[in-house]
Amino acid sequence: MIKILIPTAKEMKVCQNIAWPKLSAQTKIIIDYFSTLTVSDLEDIYRINTSAARCEAQRWQDFKAKQLTLNPAIKLFNGLMYRNIKRHNLSTSEAQFMENSVFITSALYGIIPAMTLISPHRLDFNTKIKINNNSLKVFWRENYDTFMQSDDIMVSLLSNEFETVFSPKERQKLIHLNFIEDRDGQLKTHSTISKKARGKCLTAMMENNCQTLEHLKQLRFDGFCYDNELSDSKQLTFVKKQT
């Protein structure tokens, strides 16, 4: 079976309020840490102004008191990649694929199924803090590496920020997808192309219940198709011809 790893996003869209689920021990440690920080501390950590820091301080207090809203993670994040993922009006098979094959990598929750209920938060792996005397990447490394202990095919739609949480040994198991536009023979890529294409690709995988790499290579989405010459066993490249 294929498992697809996607990152969180800075943009979020809060949509509902549901009873709180049980939190992992690691998540509780991070919440406890942030709930002790002052507004001034948060200004320095987030590099934001006092007004924004006050809002973050209140959010962490509400987090600790379990007074924040909860949303399915795949619907909470609203960055460019997420806006290009089909997230509403899913068929039964699409919902099953989303539940069983799509996982979100988080600096607060670890690796979670895409439909897990979570709260809005401001935290990524570039945040300069120490938890138990470790960076967030080191703090989560064992948890992330444990996720890789299966025979499933691990497809990465992650940025370097998230991939480097894994130890080098486990990182080697990831299958990367690259998205390139061919403009009159000139191959080009940039973050906007990649983020949109990741969302479109994930949608195509879900709609077609893609469970093997061979099936993935056959998919067509938003003008992209697999290019064997630009690919290898660990890097699958999809090219979109622009006229």
Swiss-Prot record:
GO cellular component, one term: cytosol
Source species, domain of life: Bacteria
Pfam families in UniProt: H2O2_YaaD (PF03883)
GO biological process: response to hydroperoxide
NCBIfam families for the chain: PRK02101.1-4
Family to which this protein belongs: Belongs to the UPF0246 family.
UniProt name for this protein: UPF0246 protein SAG2081
Organism: Streptococcus agalactiae serotype V (strain ATCC BAA-611 / 2603 V/R)
